[in-house]
């Protein structure tokens, strides 16, 4: 992959980047010259990620951290500044999805998705912004999903969280643009990752709803 920009000298934290979209984003940033830092919730996932980065020729730094836990996030951000350097770029990539019809979903399951997909980006962004303000620059990228704009059966919690993340993105721009902090949201479509495996299996025979029934759009 060729890149036409440079991230030399920049430290990029990509949350949940042991595999999948996060790993691909971090790998692309590394090729542009960034120093890559990532986290995952379990040591085994961090180790798996470190091995994958090493195989790709990338010298990444991995940390075990639950991004829904504010104390752990603050400690991780402080440790990254000590071990590597302050964070210049944050990619809020970590996320989960529960494919359950809304009326079958428990309130606890709904809250868990909101916690990981919306509260965690708030917590991590809040942790890195003060240092960005001090240094006069910063970049935050939120992985919002096309579900921040569209609805679909069985993903009520995920769509609600990603819709909230889209508005959090806009609010960060409004509050912190004056400090030369940019915040953007990206809405990927369906990408072949472990998270979308159940959907691909369900549609493997090619049978699916017609598009106009499959997705509810704004009218």
Please annotate each region the language model reported:
Residues 3, 55, 178, 190-217:
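A glycine/serine/threonine-rich, flexible loop-to-helix segment
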Residues 11, 18-20:
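Conserved glycine-rich cofactor-binding loop
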Residues 100-103, 150-156, 178-179:
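Active-site loop immediately N-terminal to the catalytic Tyr-X3-Lys motif
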Residues 101-102, 109-114, 211:
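Substrate-binding pocket helix/loop in short-chain dehydrogenase/reductase
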Residues 125, 161, 169:
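Active-site helix of classical SDR
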Residues 130, 174-178:
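Alpha-helical segment proximal to the catalytic Tyr-Lys
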Residues 145:
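Residue(s) in the substrate-gating loop at a strand-loop-helix junction
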């Amino acid at each position: 992959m060729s890149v036409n920009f440079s991230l030399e000298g920049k430290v990029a934290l990509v949350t949940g980047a042991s595999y999948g979209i996060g790993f691909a984003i971090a790998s692309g940033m590394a090729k542009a010259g960034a120093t890559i830092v990532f986290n995952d919730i379990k040591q085994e996932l961090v180790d798996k990620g470190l091995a994958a980065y090493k195989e790709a020729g990338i010298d990444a730094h991995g940390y075990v951290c639950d991004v829904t836990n504010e104390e752990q996030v603050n400690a991780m951000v402080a440790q990254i500044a000590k071990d590597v350097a302050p964070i210049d770029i944050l990619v809020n990539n970590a996320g989960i999805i529960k494919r359950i019809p809304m009326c079958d979903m428990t309130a606890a399951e709904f809250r868990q998705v909101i916690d990981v997909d919306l509260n965690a980006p708030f917590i991590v962004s809040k942790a890195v912004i003060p240092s960005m303000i001090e240094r006069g620059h910063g970049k935050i990228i939120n992985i919002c999903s096309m579900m921040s704009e569209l609805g679909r059966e069985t993903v009520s919690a995920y769509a609600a969280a990603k819709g909230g993340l889209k508005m959090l993105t806009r609010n960060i721009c409004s509050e912190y643009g004056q400090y030369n902090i940019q915040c953007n949201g990206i809405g990927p479509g369906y990408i072949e990752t472990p998270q979308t495996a159940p959907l691909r299996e369900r549609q493997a025979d090619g049978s699916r709803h017609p598009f106009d029934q499959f997705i509810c759009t704004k009218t």
